[in-house]
Amino acid sequence: MIFNKVIERISILKNRCRSSECSIIGVLFRMLMFRLVYKKNILTSPKVKIKNIKNIKFNKNSNLIVGLSNVNHVNNNSICYINNRGEMHVSGNVFIAKSVRVDIADSSKIILNDCYIGPETDLISYSGISIGKGSMVSWRVQFLDEDFHLVSYNDKKPKDGKITIGENCLIGNNVAINKGCIIADGCVVASHSVVNGVFLEKNCLIAGVPARVIKRNISWQH
């Protein structure tokens, strides 16, 4: 039984490596290095660069798989870069596709829970980003929890920069998720939307520039 599971996992990994045009030997070597040196369950292609691996925290039986998804419109030679100056917390199986860029500031934390991050997505965090269980992020999505440039005006209210994506959400391609956004469980954000607000109602379709709720009581399938 155990032998059959091992063979099945090797077969899945072999297919992933073939579709990503990378050597299974190189992938296995990196996996062993992460296990032996850092005690981390990380599986990556050779085109992945991770700084400060020690700052990645894993819950029990959790795995981080980076750069091994088959995405036809993304060059297999593109680099996936994770600059982890703060903390990254991984729960369940977290998949990060090719050409994703992650930058976590010293004071920040990114929490990824059994989710998928699509190719060419940027997660730039100076306050905190949390993506819930079962959520999927499409390609070229930008998460940005910091303004970088101060704009002052009368009656300006302070705003918590943290971004929270609930469970089982779908974020469409080319969406901008900005500082202070909260998206409730089961919501779908339509492609090319710009999300600036707080959406606490579950199972809504959110769309537009700026984004607003356009449908309620929706459902979607993986």
From Swiss-Prot:
SUPFAM superfamilies: Trimeric LpxA-like enzymes (SSF51161)
Alphabetical list of InterPro entries matching this protein: Hexapep, Hexapeptide_acetyltransf, Trimer_LpxA-like_sf
Alphabetized Pfam families for the sequence: Hexapep
PANTHER family cross-referenced by the UniProt entry: LIPOPOLYSACCHARIDE BIOSYNTHESIS O-ACETYL TRANSFERASE WBBJ-RELATED (PTHR23416:SF78), SIALIC ACID SYNTHASE-RELATED (PTHR23416)
Name used for this protein in its record: Uncharacterized 24.8 kDa protein in cps region
